[in-house]
């Protein structure tokens, strides 16, 4: 004879109040997969504790459960046509459980990395284990749950081997069935909070098969040869390769017009004016003197040519006056290397230039072009070589002697003026004849 199902009595009003209170204290589910198992397990526990056979009370309890779920989740799962907790639970698990396959979660649990901190390592491993077990509990597949629990238990040994050597040797002989037992054992031995500063985790890139590997894109992947950046120019390009030009400062007295002009080496010592028009050069500087090489006075060699036309004022004293002003003559007959004649007044009586003046102007002319050809000695301050305190000179005594000398000179001049000449001796002067005139 079959047994009739037991009739579940309805709940009292006080029990209904307690059910509403406990469901209201459950954390509201907002769609987080990590909190789904906690929410579902709490609701299952409350419904198992306050079971009722009254349909009216069941609808009231179901209304409290719906209010503990966010409206967005309810719209997503379409819970408007659901009237029991089993239907709602099935849709929540189907839509919000971890979608990662179980075997992938198990592999992530086994490969939990150890980064030196024992506690952080075990907490991360426990979090990954709970993710897998929570999914197995939500799916309610007994066979699959039993299978994966055995694999989790066998994976504890791989986690223990990742611990430092001194910790592994102390816990190797203990029976550790699960991860919670390992945590409790390390807490008892005082090794749960240890931090290993020498990490056993070895980075793979330090032991790469290609130590010469470069992360630059300009690398030949076949033979691992570095290719340096080169200009994009084909071998059969009609455009020839042009070397960069060397620039120098043009010789001009105006500091506002010191733009670079191209300089080409001149090995034959021939005057070659620049053929390139400089758009930045003003028109009045087209005929300016360019001291690249000398055309006249070729008998004097050039020893150290200053190609930058720079004059070191600190080394050679004062800078000489430049004599390369533009001539007022016709540009066709203008010779830039000719010395400029110094003008003289008309009544000077000198119509030409002396040889010394000509050579002096030549020296001044070449000095502006090649300042290192001729060396001259600047005026030194002799106080550096003869200090003032080396000879103690009495200035007062020296002045007194000088004054006495001047007074003596004045006294001698006065005596000479007062002395009268001997007129008598001058009037009676007779020349004396020689005794022997034949001599």
Curated annotation (Swiss-Prot):
Locations of Low complexity compositional bias? Answer: 313-333
Keywords, alphabetical:
Transposable element, Virion
Q: Does the keyword Ligase apply?
A: no
Q: For the region Disordered, give the residue spans.
A: 203-224, 243-353, 412-439
Composition skew (Polar residues), residue ranges: 245-255, 266-312
Mostly located where?
Answer: virion
Compartments (UniProt record): Virion
Stretches of the chain forming a coiled coil according to its record: none
Q: What is this protein identified as?
A: Retrovirus-related Gag polyprotein from copia-like transposable element 17.6
Q: What organism is the protein native to?
A: Drosophila melanogaster (Fruit fly)
Q: Which gene encodes it?
A: gag
